[in-house]
């Protein structure tokens, strides 16, 4: 708690300001982390959970690596299926969702953090990371990625001008993932990652969702609803880059599927969501609360405190920078 961590990774690059692995009930809070070669905070596996990541301010990460962000998590427990996760996707599927809790016993809570970046993802739940509750986070310049995993509940977060749109990547059927009451604002002018080492979705600029290698037939998430999204494209677009197909392992040249909001709703998603300006109070001064007349409030979004991130007043003033 209350640590200033910066300019790490002089020799090793696969490091983090805070790294948690094979541990239980660890709290990382009120830290200011920046100038990292890779993630600011990383949870290295799904054993045994119960961690709390809160009130951290993290920025300037992934300066020497890619496909990451301020917060990264890997599952990689004994029920994570490498063959399903990495190409080709469908030789065999991962184990049923319920088994992940044998290792990921307690939910990991990620809340009330401020992540700002110019590339990658703010919250990257990768390689089977399971049993997470993520809420009240502000991500500017980045959003989130859910790779294969289960029992992730993501709600009441704000993603603004992400280098990549919220991404659901290599989903499993019946994963029990839920995504609701979030605000997404995508602006094409800001969706140009400056770090070429990191991953951007190319032509997805301005889209609300990007999905990659989703199940061929089954549901992609258990719930996606009651979200407020806005883009200067002027309309809602979700894109599925390709679906998993049991009889075809070659993904090259597959035609992407694009969905309007009406088409998206026919799939069972975002039936109560709205495409509208969320009406932030003062975004230029990092106040991303929404005004009383915001359509997001009518959907169930709740304002959360702004500015209470990073170092506390107890941190020695001469050491601040």
Describe the role of every protein-language-model region:
Residues 1-321:
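Extracellular parallel beta-helix/beta-solenoid repeat domains
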């Amino acid at each position: 708690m209350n640590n200033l961590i910066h300019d790490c990774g002089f020799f090793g690059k696969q490091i983090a300001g805070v790294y948690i692995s094979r541990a239980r009930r660890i709290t990382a809070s009120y830290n200011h982390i920046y100038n990292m070669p890779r993630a600011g905070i990383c949870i290295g596996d799904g054993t045994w959970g119960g961690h709390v990541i809160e009130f951290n301010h993290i920025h300037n990460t992934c300066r020497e690596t890619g496909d990451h962000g301020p917060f990264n998590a890997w599952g990689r427990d004994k029920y994570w299926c490498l063959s399903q996760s990495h190409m080709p996707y469908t030789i065999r599927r991962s184990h049923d969702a319920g088994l992940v809790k044998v290792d990921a016993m307690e939910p990991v809570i990620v809340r009330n953090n401020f992540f700002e970046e110019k590339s990658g993802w703010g919250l990257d739940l990768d390689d089977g990371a399971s049993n997470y509750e993520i809420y009240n986070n502000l991500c500017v310049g980045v959003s989130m990625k859910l790779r294969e995993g289960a029992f992730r509940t993501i709600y009441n977060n704000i993603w603004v001008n992400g280098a990549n749109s919220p991404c659901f990547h290599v989903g499993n059927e019946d994963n029990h993932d839920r995504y609701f009451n979030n605000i997404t604002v995508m602006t094409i002018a800001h969706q140009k990652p400056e770090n070429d080492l990191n991953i951007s979705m190319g032509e997805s600029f301005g889209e609300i969702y990007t999905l990659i290698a989703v199940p061929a037939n089954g549901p992609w998430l258990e719930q996606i609803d009651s979200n407020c999204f806005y883009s200067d494209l002027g309309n809602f677009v979700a894109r599925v880059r390709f679906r998993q197909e049991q009889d075809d392992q070659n993904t090259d040249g597959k035609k992407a599927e694009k969905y309007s909001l009406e088409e998206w709703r026919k799939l069972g998603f975002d039936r109560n969501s709205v495409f509208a300006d969320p009406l932030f109070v003062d975004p230029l001064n990092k106040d991303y609360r929404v005004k009383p007349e915001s359509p997001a409030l009518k959907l169930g979004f709740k304002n959360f405190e702004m500015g209470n991130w990073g170092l506390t007043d107890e941190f020695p003033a001469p050491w601040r920078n």
